[in-house]
């Protein structure tokens, strides 16, 4: 393969990895926002539990709230895992980009 073709291939690879890195950066930001939103929902549900009175069919309402809280906690866990995976891929792409530049 000629040097020109190698260089062109390297440029294409660099552009592809750089775009992927930026996309991952945006996804990480989006996931962090989702984590914050769900943490706020958990706090809201915790506060709501404190205000429920016995004359409101307490056990049923409390059961529903606990189920909702559990769902939000599961979502946060999923987002944290996905965020970690994306961060790892982003780090690897950064290393590869540095290697291509040199």
Swiss-Prot record:
Protein name: Pole-localizer protein TmaR
Biological function: Pole-localizer protein involved in the regulation of several cellular processes.
Superkingdom field: Bacteria
UniProt KW keywords: Coiled coil, Cytoplasm
Keyword Transferase: no
Chief localization: cytoplasm
Compartments it resides in: Cytoplasm
Gene name of this polypeptide: tmaR
HAMAP family: Pole_loc_TmaR
Keyword Cytoplasm: yes
Membership in a protein family: Belongs to the pole-localizer TmaR family.
Coiled-coil features, chain-numbered ranges: 69-96
InterPro entries given in the database record: DUF496 (IPR007458)
GO cellular component, one term: cytosol
Pfam families: DUF496 (PF04363)
Species in which this protein is naturally found: Buchnera aphidicola subsp. Acyrthosiphon pisum (strain APS)
């Amino acid at each position: 393969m000629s040097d020109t073709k190698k260089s062109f291939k390297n440029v294409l690879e660099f552009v592809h990895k750089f775009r992927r890195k930026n996309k991952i950066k945006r996804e990480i930001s989006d996931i962090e926002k989702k984590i914050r939103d769900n943490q706020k929902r958990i706090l809201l549900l915790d506060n709501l539990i404190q205000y429920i009175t016995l004359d409101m069919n307490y056990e049923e309402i409390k059961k529903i709230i606990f189920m909702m809280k559990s769902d939000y906690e599961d979502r946060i866990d999923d987002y944290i895992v996905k965020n970690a995976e994306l961060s790892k891929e982003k780090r690897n792409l950064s290393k590869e980009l540095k290697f291509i530049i040199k």
